[in-house]
Amino acid sequence: MSAKEVKFGVDARDRMLRGVDILANAVKVTLGPKGRNVVLDKSFGAPRITKDGVTVAKEIELEDKFENMGAQMVREVASKSADLAGDGTTTATVLAAAIVREGAKSVAAGMNPMDLKRGIDLAVEAVVADLVKNSKKVTSNEEIAQVGTISANGDAEIGKFLSDAMKKVGNEGVITVEEAKSLETELDVVEGMQFDRGYISPYFVTNADKMRVEFDDAYILINEKKLSNLNELLPLLEAVVQTGKPLVIVAEDVEGEALATLVVNRLRGGLKVAAVKAPGFGDRRKAMLQDIAILTGGQAISEDLGIKMENVTLAMLGKAKKVMIDKENTTIVNGAGKKADIEARVAQIKAQIEETTSDYDREKLQERLAKLAGGVAVIRVGGATEIEVKERKDRVDDAMHATRAAVEEGILPGGGVALLRASEQLKRIKTQNDDQKTGVEIVRKALSWPARQIAINAGEDGSVIVGKILEKDQYSYGFDSQSGEYGDMVKKGIIDPTKVVRAAIQNAASVAALLITTEAMIAELPKKGNAGGGMPPGGGGMGGMDF
């Protein structure tokens, strides 16, 4: 085991604080509508330009191990806020740095770190309660657009795209963000359920111009196994032919005799049919087939349930108003499933999302949820250069998470105003001793920093602006740094999602309190350079040897 270096007390906290400040200073320049960009060097390709706090934080690694520990702890604040609310990472970083800075001063002055921590925890509880109390539900599409615009750094076009997307696919629907091939940003909405499997054979195509299958009022057979023998299918096919409606077969695979017969019947015109491979793999495939069955009001045919193919009746088939299948995707619109069944399935998937610990599983479950709940919207972000597209895509991602958070927990006045107002409530908190009172005071001071930093980034005097905002009693009164005017933030459309503000203060205080209570730090000693690896002139790679 290699030797370690240990730092104690003031020395440890000073090093840590330096790291916190370096990271916070790099991140805080991006805050607010007049925040600046940060350029990140990439080991390959062009540098990346971003205004996203968490992206900047993730790039920072410091040479000094002890400074780096401080920076990494605060980076965790930004990451946690991004995971929980998807936005507010810069606010969280600014808050954490402010709490650590004031806390370190108090500890150096001889106060008890554990009492300071208890005071900080008390203050955060009171702040969260105040935020929740003053939170307003999002009622209109216009408010969703405003949240998106603020989070996308004042880009109204992005705000509008997001509110349109949420209007079309619902609050639970999936909105994905991709890079466009053109200059324009566009919105593409897929209604109903879409999965990434196309037709098994091109002979099923009904619309030759678009090379796709289009069926109206179709039956859907959902089968878990491969279909290779036609005999077991015949009774069902005859029943479907008599109804005159088309049939879509979703199965693990359709091959051999079964596929050949379906194609021949399709070409002769007697049977409108198309076959598609089932989406997903393994257990996920079973779950997705069950989703399709619930959406279309059918039954997933599975030998586990003791249902054999030859016993399948028309009543077991799903139905949909429209089915479209191209080479790569199948879309089912207006399935005939019962609303109550679909809602129960949605609730079940939501419960699984809450329980899962894997990010990959969570993403897949959210996709399934969206397909059941409404549809999928794709925002394709355009721009003149790849660097511009990437920077804009970062902002669209932030804005998308912010609008989701706003729908979930409501909205508050933006521009750091909600935290400023909450700081006034902290004057009334009863504490057990003076050190705890100082802990509350540390949070109270820190809460003014987001509003102050937004003003500083806009070239204003932060202290003057915070003072003027607090002079007025009106809750949503604040400073619009874009226009340089004071007024009602909500009426001006400057609003933040409650969830984002709440996550920012909770995560910032959690990590900052841990940093304040740190008394020792341990890191590996830097490796001493040995001569063996060098290449001095004429050494031929044998560094340190005399010739």
From Swiss-Prot:
It catalyses: ATP + H2O + a folded polypeptide = ADP + phosphate + an unfolded polypeptide. GO terms for cellular component: cytoplasm. PROSITE patterns: CHAPERONINS_CPN60. InterPro entries: Chaperonin_Cpn60_CS, Cpn60/GroEL, Cpn60/GroEL/TCP-1, GroEL-like_apical_dom_sf, GROEL-like_equatorial_sf, TCP-1-like_intermed_sf. ATP binds at residues 30-33, 51, 87-91, 415, 496. CDD domains: GroEL. It is an enzyme of class 5 (isomerase). Coiled coil: none annotated. Keywords: ATP-binding, Chaperone, Cytoplasm, Isomerase, Nucleotide-binding. Transmembrane segments: none annotated. Its EC number is 5.6.1.7. GO terms for biological process: protein refolding. NCBIfam families: GroEL, PRK00013.1, PRK12849.1, PRK12850.1, PRK12851.1, PRK14104.1. HAMAP family: CH60. Belongs to the chaperonin (HSP60) family. Together with its co-chaperonin GroES, plays an essential role in assisting protein folding. The GroEL-GroES system forms a nano-cage that allows encapsulation of the non-native substrate proteins and provides a physical environment optimized to promote and accelerate protein folding. Forms a cylinder of 14 subunits composed of two heptameric rings stacked back-to-back. Interacts with the co-chaperonin GroES. This is Chaperonin GroEL 1. It comes from Rhodopseudomonas palustris (strain BisB18). The gene is groEL1.
